[in-house]
């Protein structure tokens, strides 16, 4: 009799995806982040579902409903902080996952990579809308500033912004629709994740060397299930440390004040995971130029496979490309720092230089480094 695991139409799919899946024997801990992202998504959907049972998406009661969740609901404070800090863990894993893809040349699986970029956009949109829901000062003004950027689009901009707002300012209609979309998008993301995995399993995983490993594969279970569980424990430890000891470390104190359209906070800034893009947006004095730079800072990931000039896939044996990669990492950390600073000297010029360097590294320095390495191979 055939094992049900291999014969049942539904269980067979799970088996071929997570149990008998052939995986390269050499993949390192940098390959753990895919499974961690899946767990983050599941955690966010679960905690979000329970929060939605107590939250009200009305401007007059939203702020108080969040306070009610924290004070009166059984373990409501824990649900709220797991959800808020879970988003931070989600983005840490996301950025490390994308960084891994860049370093080891995983972007050469073009369908998987492009699907990943779409997922990144979807997660960013979800996180932005979720930040608006507590209806604190930074929620309101963050929503106002970011949605207002669309008014820079020629001809249709103003109409588009008013259409998104559902009126002439961020108000009741905006909050209600943001809650609806914030609830809906994670389920769409779950479907996109399945497509992402479908594309990945067409080719199989990449490995640190970047060399095809078809002749050296091992089953995913038990080897990588055990390895992923270790990563999971480490992530849960980090998340619980945040939630139980420093729940407000990554939040903004302004969000503990109810939204007030008549009082603008001195420094409007998004959550830490958007600061790099916010710094790029602010570094350009022109509104439309800033919006384009903001969009391109993420969209540029799509053209990375086209900018690959090296004869080798991975950066593991390419010292010049490694230098450019770590320069990019340092530049992104600089942008993240600048995004959280006020718009004054010397932060303005640092932000502008870091923004120029960001695009320069990806479009010019990385492809040139690879061409030089090709010449060094001959030498």
UniProtKB/Swiss-Prot annotation:
GO terms for cellular component: mitochondrial inner membrane; respiratory chain complex III. SUPFAM superfamilies: a domain/subunit of cytochrome bc1 complex (Ubiquinol-cytochrome c reductase), Transmembrane di-heme cytochromes. A ubiquinone binds at residue 201. The chain crosses the membrane at residues 33-53, 77-98, 113-133, 178-198, 226-246, 288-308, 320-340, 347-367. GO terms for biological process: mitochondrial electron transport, ubiquinol to cytochrome c. Binds 2 heme b groups non-covalently. PANTHER family: CYTOCHROME B (PTHR19271:SF16). Component of the ubiquinol-cytochrome c reductase complex (complex III or cytochrome b-c1 complex) that is part of the mitochondrial respiratory chain. The b-c1 complex mediates electron transfer from ubiquinol to cytochrome c. Contributes to the generation of a proton gradient across the mitochondrial membrane that is then used for ATP synthesis. The cytochrome bc1 complex contains 11 subunits: 3 respiratory subunits (MT-CYB, CYC1 and UQCRFS1), 2 core proteins (UQCRC1 and UQCRC2) and 6 low-molecular weight proteins (UQCRH/QCR6, UQCRB/QCR7, UQCRQ/QCR8, UQCR10/QCR9, UQCR11/QCR10 and a cleavage product of UQCRFS1). This cytochrome bc1 complex then forms a dimer. This is Cytochrome b. It comes from Laephotis wintoni (De Winton's long-eared bat).
